[in-house]
């Protein structure tokens, strides 16, 4: 009978030190990859008013926003597959280069006669932003795949929770830099040009310094030293893992349910992020509304860290932790539905920050640590060329659901306005989305609470945190032998 064995000790001091060194490099590089993507994306958003003032039709700008969202969603499905089939670092670098080109073409169009050509202007800018969305889609799935190659399931929640702060760092950098450029009286085009160029330079640095896997860096791992032993005693190298197909990834246990659940959670996040400033303007001036709503974004940053850390404390029961976060969120949404008009400002600020944490935590952890856990399913026998595809499915499904769900919000507002209750129906809708998303994880929650042999897992009471991988049992050294 064929079996797998480990023929060398991988735990030498030199090997461990080298591994830890490269982990820091990978963490920092992929963090910067995603931060750069958000910096360039947000920089464009910050100067949309200037773009329209230069002559671009507001309808074209609106179409650019919608087009970006849909190509980003569709691109997530494709780029995840590319990251599993080719060098993920090269795919990420390609995304960074592509984003640079698209943004520079937008600046070029705004600096030449193109912007004054009524027949060609709309097509130029819309095409640039559609392609830009596809290139930006490399960020989530492929960077997550690289991280998954370097960080095991032990402590994964906290590590990925810290890692997901990248988007906020990028957004903050964009806000600070764009504000400085505009306040200093420089041309608004520099708000896009400078981050675009830095983005491209970082792509080259990333391409030549980041190894895809420990094996590429010359680090000995169990995988690199494993051999197959036949009944006759002959040894041969284990065949390299092959990328799994889209359908196979979609049919992995819990991928479908998490993809759908994430869609509802992301819809709640998008609604809060985009609608809060508008909702608050019925009680505050525009400037105050933006400041107050920013507390929601501030709360999202520690959300992923807290959610990941708590899920590690509870031995990887991420579905249970996510459900707890969502369970706390529902009564707060109900509170807003009924009493938002009378909530004191100080209490409102605290609640918004807390709600940002509750929404941001599950959203961030599902697309990182949970996706990595799902890609570790025993049915694909530790195939490390599945994570990009799995993350792409979850990311893409969430973006599509959120994009279509946004269409319901103005309709619900009009109904509420006609009935004299304002945004109350919108809040009810968000509560329904929260409950629906949590319900989709009910099977996973039950298995985490009541694990059994049929689920290929041992009871949690018999295992430590280092043994439980969240979605499969990790064999002990004795079992490996």
PLM region descriptions:
Residues 85-96, 312-327:
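Cytoplasmic membrane-interface "Motif A"-like loop-to-helix N-cap segments
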Residues 128-167:
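Cytoplasmic helix-loop-helix junction between adjacent transmembrane helices
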Residues 42, 68-77, 137, 171-172, ...:
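Residue-level signature of mid-helix packing/kink "hotspots" within the transmembrane helices
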Residues 97-118, 327-342:
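C-terminal ends and interior cores of transmembrane alpha-helices
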Residues 157-176, 182-183, 299-300, 391-405:
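Glycine-rich segments within core transmembrane alpha-helices of 12-TM secondary carriers
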Residues 44-46, 252-305, 363-368, 402-409:
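Extracytoplasmic gate region of multi-pass secondary transporters
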Residues 163-214:
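Helix-loop-helix hairpin linking two adjacent transmembrane segments in secondary transporters
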Residues 25-56, 272-277, 366-367:
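Extracytoplasmic
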């Amino acid at each position: 009978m064929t079996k797998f064995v480990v023929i060398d000790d991988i735990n030498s001091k030199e090997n461990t030190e080298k591994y830890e060194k490269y982990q820091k490099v990978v963490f920092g590089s992929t963090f910067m990859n995603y931060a750069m993507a958000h910096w360039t994306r947000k920089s464009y958003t910050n100067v949309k008013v200037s773009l329209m003032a230069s002559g671009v039709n507001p309808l074209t700008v609106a179409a650019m926003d919608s087009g970006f969202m849909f190509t980003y969603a569709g691109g997530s499905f494709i780029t995840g597959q590319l990251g599993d089939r080719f060098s993920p670092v090269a795919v990420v670098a390609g995304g960074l280069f592509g984003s640079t080109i698209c943004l520079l073409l937008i600046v070029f169009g705004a600096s030449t006669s193109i912007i004054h050509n009524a027949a060609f202007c709309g097509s130029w800018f819309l095409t640039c932003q559609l392609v830009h969305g596809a290139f930006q889609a490399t960020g989530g799935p492929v960077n997550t795949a690289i991280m998954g190659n370097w960080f095991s399931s032990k402590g994964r929640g906290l590590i990925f929770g810290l890692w997901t702060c990248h988007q906020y760092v990028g957004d903050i950098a964009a806000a600070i830099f764009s504000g400085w450029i505009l306040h200093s009286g420089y041309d608004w085009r520099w708000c896009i040009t400078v981050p675009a160029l830095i983005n491209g330079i970082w792509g080259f640095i990333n391409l030549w310094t980041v190894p895809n896997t420990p094996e590429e860096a010359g680090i000995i791992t169990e995988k690199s030293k494993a051999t197959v032993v036949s009944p006759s005693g002959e040894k041969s190298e284990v065949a390299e893992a092959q990328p799994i197909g889209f359908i196979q990834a979609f049919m992995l246990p819990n991928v479908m349910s998490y993809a759908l659940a994430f869609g509802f959670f992301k819809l709640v996040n998008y609604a809060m992020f985009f609608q809060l400033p508008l909702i608050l303007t019925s009680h505050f001036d525009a400037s105050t509304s933006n400041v107050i709503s920013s507390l929601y974004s501030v709360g999202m940053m520690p959300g992923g860290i807290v959610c990941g850390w708590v899920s590690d404390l509870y031995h990887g029961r991420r579905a249970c932790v996510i459900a707890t976060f969502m369970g706390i969120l529902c009564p707060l949404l109900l509170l807003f539905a009924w009493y938002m008009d009378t909530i004191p400002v100080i209490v409102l600020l605290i609640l918004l920050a807390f709600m940002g944490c509750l929404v941001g935590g599950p959203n961030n952890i599902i697309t990182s640590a949970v996706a990595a856990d799902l890609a570790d399913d025993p049915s694909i026998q530790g195939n490390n060329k599945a994570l990009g595809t799995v993350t792409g499915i979850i990311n893409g499904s969430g973006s599509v659901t959120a994009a279509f769900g946004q269409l319901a919000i103005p309709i619900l507002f009009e109904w509420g306005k006609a009935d004299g209750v304002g945004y109350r129906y919108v809040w009810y809708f968000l509560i329904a989305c929260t409950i629906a998303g949590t319900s989709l994880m009910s099977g996973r929650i039950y298995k985490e609470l009541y694990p059994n042999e049929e689920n290929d897992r041992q009871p949690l009471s018999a295992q430590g945190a280092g043994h439980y991988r969240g979605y499969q049992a990790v064999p002990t050294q004795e079992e490996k032998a």
